[in-house]
Amino acid sequence: MEGDLEGRVALVTGVSRRIGIGFAIARDLLAAGARVLVHSWAPHDAEQPWGADPAGTDGVLAALGGIGPRLAHVAADFADPEAPARVVAHAVETFGALDVLVANHARSSIQDLTEVTAAELDLCWAVNARASVLLAQAYAAQHDDSRPGGRIILFTSGQHLAPMSRELPYAISKGAVQQVTLSLADALADRGITVNAVNPGPVDTGWADPELTRSVARALPAGRWGAPDDVARLVRWLASDDSAWITGQTINSEGGFRRWVM
């Protein structure tokens, strides 16, 4: 598949850690020949238990080959409703077009029904759901339909398959992405732009504690969590011409995850 995205321009959001899903996606799209704008918002990771990448943003970009003719970077907080349009505009200003949007960013939140606050509900909704729609809106407004390969790839986390009662703000906002996918796919189908969502299942990006890591691994037939590379391969295919007949789908790439045995 080397070179199958030659001439295409991609935006990948949520590229903030070298062990993260966004990093693996950006690396694979670059390897396939695309020019890529990566987005990050390091303050979010810094306030989470797993922390920001110790190498910082510069280290993440260096690991992708460094800023140059095929790689650019933008930092933005998607809690700001104007940020999605600015990020898309930056991609077009930098590379002259935008063909592939990968909305991989997320705000994580651990709050159950007794703990949940209006502020956290609003913030997760703004980042996870609203920003995904506004990114798609800005993407569609600038897209040149004469260019091949119009792709929007969103991310959910299996909320349509099982409850996540300990993570209500996250689960509710990410669960909405499945309906966003269906509706945007219909809205953009006549323009030749496909819209799909990826549910990557449990992926080891360093966030889980040892007990959860062991418990989830027992529920996966391979005996291991998914890896960022597993997700990146799927996204690379969805970004390619080979996926042109697929739209409006939420693809569950979970390695046969048996939730019921946990």
Language-model-detected regions and their locations in the chain:
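Canonical Rossmann dinucleotide-binding motif of NAD(H)/NADP(H)-dependent dehydrogenases/reductases
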Residues: 3-39, 43
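Active-site Tyr-X3-Lys motif and surrounding loop/helix of classical short-chain dehydrogenase/reductase
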Residues: 86-93, 111-115, 119-126, 215
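Conserved NAD(P)H cofactor-binding loop of Rossmann-fold oxidoreductase domains
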Residues: 104-109, 256
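Catalytic Tyr-X3-Lys loop
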Residues: 107, 114-133, 153, 177, ...
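Active-site helix of classical SDR
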Residues: 136, 173
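Short C-terminal tail/terminal secondary-structure segment
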Residues: 162, 214, 218-219, 236, ...
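Short, small/polar-rich loop/turn modules that mediate ligand/substrate recognition or access, typified
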Residues: 189, 194, 246-248
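A conserved structural motif in NAD(P)-dependent oxidoreductases
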Residues: 220-231
